[in-house]
Swiss-Prot record:
This is ATP-dependent 6-phosphofructokinase. It comes from Streptococcus sanguinis (strain SK36). Mg(2+) binds at D103. Keywords: Allosteric enzyme, ATP-binding, Cytoplasm, Glycolysis, Kinase, Magnesium, Metal-binding, Nucleotide-binding, Transferase. Homotetramer. Pathway: Carbohydrate degradation; glycolysis; D-glyceraldehyde 3-phosphate and glycerone phosphate from D-glucose: step 3/4. It is found in: Cytoplasm.
Length: 336
């Protein structure tokens, strides 16, 4: 394989630039040419494909976001969209593609491989909800950003003896809430993977103030409900007059990546190039027990594949991601 391309797709995540840098420089060191596909699959179809060299990716390791830009392009799920993209790949002499993004991006990588263009997925999302890996690129930075914000909110919360409901990102996963909540000493952490009783939350808040606590911090994963809705439920269940709500929002997707995300992204990007050089496609890289691994994107659970097809042709996750609820137990045991 002499010429490959790299793209980023879906929501951006800190560390994507570090992964792109690793792909480009590892490929060059292996004697390969590298092209950047701008604006994800939409850019592939539009022919936004340009050569990259070592200088192109200089000084981007510390930058958040993705300098290749990203876009959601649902049309690539259709054969017509895939064939248009493949036509552009052929036009530019590209033989393999590294796709950095979430599970939707993986589906595109799988389709490219089926059409004869080996593609390797690299997990880039702050949500940490991709199967086949312990951690995704951007998660550590998002947790650190959320933790820093929660620390600041605690300062003002203590000054006024207030309760704060702080909503963090994560889509349907509670990983950011759990990690940021524990790291910031949150009093309550509410995640989609675990049920809760609003009356028990209210009782815990009141008990905390009775013990002399100066604040009460509730970290809420967005996959449960909005912070405003949760606050209304608290007010309905008890006297919560001095209650404030904060939605951290897209600040969690930006910023310079942490050292861990930079190293993780570099390892994953380089490993993806190694696989393409060996002619391997239709797989996604990951990290398990601090070791690089790869898993088939499509197949059976027994084969270790991430996704499978139903009889109706629908793509389903073989082993859906769930946040580690041992962390929830830990938080309860140390917040007394």
């Amino acid at each position: 394989m002499k010429r490959i391309a790299v793209l980023t797709s879906g929501g951006d995540a800190p560390g994507m630039n570090a992964a792109i840098r690793a792909v480009v420089r590892k490929a060059i060191s292996e004697g390969m040419e590298v092209y950047g596909i701008y604006d994800g699959y939409a850019g592939m179809v539009a022919g936004e494909i340009y050569p990259l060299d070592a200088t192109s990716v200089g000084d981007i390791i510390s930058r958040g976001g993705t300098f290749l830009h990203s876009a959601r392009y649902p049309e690539f799920a259709q054969v017509e969209g895939q064939l248009k993209g493949i036509e552009q790949l052929k036009k530019h002499g590209i033989e393999g593609v590294v796709v950095i993004g979430g599970d939707g991006s993986y589906h595109g990588a799988m389709r490219l491989t089926e059409h004869g263009f080996p593609a390797v997925g690299v997990p880039g999302t702050i949500d940490n909800d991709i199967v086949g890996t312990d951690f995704t690129i951007g998660f550590d930075t998002a947790v650190t950003t959320a933790m820093d914000a929660i620390d600041k909110i605690r300062d003002t919360s203590s000054s006024h003896r207030r309760t704060f409901v702080i909503e963090v990102m994560g889509r349907n996963a509670g990983d950011i809430a759990l990690w940021a909540g524990i790291a910031s000493g949150a009093d309550e952490i509410i995640v989609p993977e675990e049920g809760f009783k609003i009356e028990e939350v209210v009782e815990s808040i009141k008990n905390g103030y009775a013990k002399g606590k100066k604040h009460n911090i509730i970290v809420l994963a967005e996959g449960v409900m909005s912070a405003d809705e949760f606050a209304e439920k608290l007010k309905e269940a008890g006297d919560m007059s001095d209650l404030r709500v904060t939605e951290l929002g897209h600040i969690q997707r930006g910023g310079s990546p942490t050292a861990r995300d930079r190293v993780l992204a570099s390892r994953m990007g380089a490993h993806a190039v190694k696989l393409l050089k060996e002619g391997i496609g239709g797989v996604a890289v990951g990290i398990r027990n601090e070791q690089m691994v790869e898993s088939p994107i499509l197949g059976t659970a027994e084969e270790g594949a991430l996704f499978s097809l139903t009889a109706e042709g629908k793509i389903v996750v073989n082993n859906p991601h769930k946040a580690d609820l041992d962390l929830a137990d830990l938080n309860r045991s140390i917040n007394i």
